[in-house]
Amino acid sequence: MPYRMSRQAYAETYGPTVGDRIRLADTELFIQVEQDFTTYGDEVKFGGGKVIRDGMGQSPIANADGAVDLVITNALILDWWGIVKADIGIKDGKIFKIGKAGNPYIQDHVDIIIGPGTEALAGEGMILTAGGIDTHIHFICPQQIEVAIASGITTMIGGGTGPATGTNATTCTPGPWNMYRMLQAADAFPMNLGFLGKGNASQPQGLVEQIFAGAIGLKLHEDWGTTPATIDTCLTVADEYDVQVAIHTDTLNEAGFVEDTIAAFKNRAIHTYHTEGAGGGHAPDIIKVCGQANVLPSSTNPTRPYTVNTLDEHLDMLMVCHHLDPAIAEDVAFAESRIRRETIAAEDILHDLGAFSMIASDSQAMGRVGEVIIRTWQTSHKMKVQRGSLTGDAEADNLRAKRYVAKYTINPAITHGIAQYVGSVEAGKLADLCLWRPAFFGVKPEIVIKGGMIAWSQMGDANASIPTPQPVHMRPMFGSFAGARNATSLTFVSQAALEREIPQQLGLRKSAVAVSGTRQLTKQDMKLNDALPHIEVDSESYEVRADGELLTCEPATVLPMAQRYFLF
């Protein structure tokens, strides 16, 4: 017998469905459900008197015969490929299926089997995203990893050895011995980790040995000398061993100008860090490289978005991070040359146009490791307020939302050759997922799933009679401990290191997998962020133009996802 529910009652019971709109946190961004994979009247839901019971929504089918390990019911997926309502089945730590869950003996169109071996996680009224990927990590302290995963990051790529002066300034894990020790340390964390070697060398031998040791890429940094010769050598080695190169270019233009650096690229794929330039790079016009087809450009979060405080805080941060002396006039001039309101304002707009493809942190080296996701959505909000809806976003902000979520999920995964494992909510990938209450979206995840197991979660007083009494905050869960963290996380290495059995020699307990497919990439591979405008920068005024149009915007005086959510 049919039963009719109001749209509001349905959303409150099973979550939003096609046509419903959801506000993201306290921003001016709204997303609209595009498709619903569940079946009206045949939804599954767990609880007393609910559907997932034996003989109803739960079948007697064993896990060995096809039932999943975990089902997330009625969640709203937000990913670069769509905004859809679905059940999500997880099996053996991977996403098994996005579709309709239930008991195939009594329900139609079931492609996710719930059985006696299936755990249930209520996704009704929740937003599900892929775990974030931060590709600009200075591994200065291990506590960064706790902060990152608590914010929704599940993969970290960068370099360092701890609070050494070199690591404070550059994202490099230099040399085999340091690489081995960091790979061994990676076993201690419920986080996918990959390390970049130092790429600054005019001869290849010192670069090759780092790749053999496990480096998944090489980092060129001006503090080690990013000259045209080192750029060419580094990219040549990367091409041979299929690893990515990340670059922080020559702020002082000592070894050449931006045109010389572009020439040294020789149309080879490269990930340009903080491409606007406040984080470092040819002053004042490094931003030009985002119009090059072989350049995969990212921002770091100190300049995201442009606010009334952005310029003031940058000078002190820069002096500390790059070991500069405020008593030396040349050091102060070096710092001031990198901080330009005009290029930072243009960066906002270039993100909105899809010309900048990624956002990362620059952790403790001017950036905040726990704010990649917040800063991304604050930028999106600011652009919605200042520039209006994107073409095609009439009733909701779906295109803009998909463009911005791609900046910290699929695009960094593609760039660093790990998209076959992580970076999106798609079948076959590691189940690194974040569940968000819409009111807290992008700010504080409700649950972080790592390799199919809950690793971190909002949790109340452990001595309380129920899980919810205050103080409720992010805490590590069972997936973060002992063998579980090793079974649910990956360590990324080079194919050359796998062939030399480096993980076995080091006794690594995590699964080690190789990066691949990094050298033939172009900007066109960046999902929803593949624009190639012709960029011009006035050397006197620093004004930025894209295809002849002046790019400028006002700094924000207030932002969402800020004080409303935090006491400190």
From Swiss-Prot:
Q: Summarize where substrate binds, as residue positions.
A: 221
Residue numbers binding Ni(2+) 2: 219, 248, 274
- Recorded GO MF terms: nickel cation binding; urease activity
The record's keywords, sorted A to Z, are: Cytoplasm, Hydrolase, Metal-binding, Nickel
* UniProt-annotated catalytic positions: 322
User: What's a single GO CC term here?
Assistant: cytoplasm
Q: Which residues carry this modification: N6-carboxylysine?
A: 219
Give EC number(s), comma-separated: 3.5.1.5
PTM section of the record: Carboxylation allows a single lysine to coordinate two nickel ions.
- Which cofactor is essential here? Ni cation
According to the lineage, what is the superkingdom? Bacteria
Pathway in which this enzyme or protein is active: Nitrogen metabolism; urea degradation; CO(2) and NH(3) from urea (urease route): step 1/1
- One Pfam entry for this protein is Urease_alpha
Q: Where is the Urease domain positioned along the sequence?
A: 131-568
What does the UniProt cofactor note say? Binds 2 nickel ions per subunit.
A single GO BP annotation from the record? urea catabolic process
What subcellular compartments does it reside in? Cytoplasm
Task: Tell me yes or no: is Cytoplasm among this UniProt entry's keywords.
Answer: yes
Q: Which reaction does it catalyse?
A: urea + 2 H2O + H(+) = hydrogencarbonate + 2 NH4(+)
Chain positions recorded as Ni(2+) 1 binding sites: 136, 138, 219, 362
What do we know about how this protein assembles, alone or with others? Heterotrimer of UreA (gamma), UreB (beta) and UreC (alpha) subunits. Three heterotrimers associate to form the active enzyme.
Q: Which family does it belong to?
A: Belongs to the metallo-dependent hydrolases superfamily. Urease alpha subunit family.
Could you tell me what this protein is called? Urease subunit alpha
Taxonomic placement:
Bacteria, Bacillati, Cyanobacteriota, Cyanophyceae, Nostocales
